A protein has these predicted regions:
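Catalytic machinery of carbohydrate-active enzymes
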Residues: 1-403
Length: 403
């Protein structure tokens, strides 16, 4: 059967044609909470909008702006706020769209800006509190992921500097300063006045309540069979030291007399003349576990100890985290600065003795003798010089039940 061109045209014309709907081009609103609340407007319609960023908990308008299509806007606040974002037609003032922060079931990426041991151990459990409150999926980046990934299998751990994808919100935990001025768009308040852990609670919008992390500990035996106490008399700054002359040796002798071995576990080597001079001489009658050994060995030493005695340093935070009874000696920082679950030994007469310069001054790490108020005077380091060994012994007796 043959067809002419005319017949084909007629056949085509007789076909019932389906009417396709016309495509309507509209602008699209996209919301995210990466380093703060953000509203993006995409689309071809030339139109102006009013965007409002509202703190729902305070019922407070934080930021309002006018936007066109193919622009984005955000307030500069990077810490958690329970945001509501509203978009209005500028011409009619009609509410066109809104979005309330809701992380349930979504990926939230939380990064730690610090590699310090204390910061990491203090801030990590707050992330767990955030997860439980918002029922979100946590992606986390720390400098010590190997301590935690087995303890928090429900989280995704990424290395520092690595990207995470398909995230709804991102928060960075840290102390953020610019020219010694707190950056209040990243930290809600001056962090030097707070417990270290509250830094994370504030940034993540949580009520502060001290909590401890779960941390992987080595499956190793006790370092010695006898009962023992760990000491860590060194720290990263001289101002952190316990400066009472002969104080550490007095404590060691007392513990030995009561039948306890004493393990010294600092990175600074026992027998090094310069380091020993900061302790009044080489400490005697200790088991030397100092030096560049793996941190896992120190964690194991602390975990099995009957007691840990240290300063405001990372090893004290490890002791707190692994739930070993802890005595923390410091006049350099105010008692609220570190953790509360310890015996905190502080300057005995704080009203008349200088103390807590850490909380009000900026440490000069290049000056080992830094003491902002009394350097080169007879009051140099008086904050810890005035802490007597008997005060420490009284705390030892309480923990070890020595009468």
């Amino acid at each position: 059967m043959s067809f002419t061109t005319d017949s084909l045209v007629k056949e085509y014309s007789n076909i019932t044609k389906k009417v396709l709907p016309s495509k309507t081009f509209e602008n699209k609103f996209i919301y995210s909470f990466i380093h703060g609340a953000k509203c993006e407007i995409f689309g071809p319609l030339e139109k102006e909008y009013i965007i409002k960023f509202i703190d729902k908990d305070k019922n407070e308008l934080i930021y309002e702006t006018v936007s066109k299509n193919n622009h984005w806007h955000k307030p500069n606040i990077e810490y958690f706020v329970n945001w509501r974002i509203e978009v209005y037609d500028k011409e009619t003032n009609e509410l066109l769209d809104s979005h309330d922060f809701d992380a349930e079931g979504k990926n939230v990426f939380i990064t730690l800006d610090s590699s310090a041991i204390g910061d990491t151990l203090a801030w990590l459990p707050v992330i767990k509190q955030f997860e439980e409150k918002h029922k979100c999926k946590i992606i986390v980046s720390t400098f010590h992921n190997d301590w935690f990934y087995k303890e928090y299998p429900e989280w995704e751990f990424v290395s520092p500097g690595m990207q995470a994808f398909d995230i709804y919100a991102l928060y960075c935990l840290g102390w953020f300063y610019n020219d010694q001025q707190i950056e209040l768009h990243k930290n809600p308040q001056e962090v030097k006045n707070l417990p270290l852990q509250q830094t994370a609670s504030d940034i993540l919008g949580l009520e502060y309540k001290e909590s401890k992390p779960r941390i992987s500990t080595p499956k190793k035996d006790r370092p010695v069979e006898e009962k023992y106490v760990c000491i860590a008399p060194h720290a990263s700054a001289h101002a952190k030291y316990w400066m009472y002359p002969g104080g550490w040796q007095t404590i060691i002798d007392y513990l030995n007399d009561k039948g306890y071995k004493v393990l010294m576990i600092t990175h600074e080597v026992l027998g090094d003349e310069w380091h020993d001079s900061k302790l009044g001489g080489t400490l005697q009658n200790v088991i030397d576990k100092t030096g560049n050994g793996p941190l896992s060995d120190r964690i194991n030493d602390i975990k099995h100890a009957d007691l840990f005695i240290g300063l405001g340093s990372g090893l004290s935070w490890i002791s707190w985290a692994v739930r070993t009874p802890t005595i923390l000696i410091s006049g350099f920082s105010a008692p609220h600065t570190e953790f509360q679950d310890c015996e905190r030994i502080f300057t005995p007469d704080p009203d008349n003795t200088c103390n807590s310069c850490f909380n009000r001054e900026w440490l000069n790490p290049g000056d080992w003798e830094w003491c902002p108020d009394h350097k080169d005077t007879d009051r140099h380091f008086e904050c810890s010089k005035t802490i007597e060994p008997q005060t420490v012994i009284n705390s030892i007796n309480k923990f070890l039940k020595i009468s």
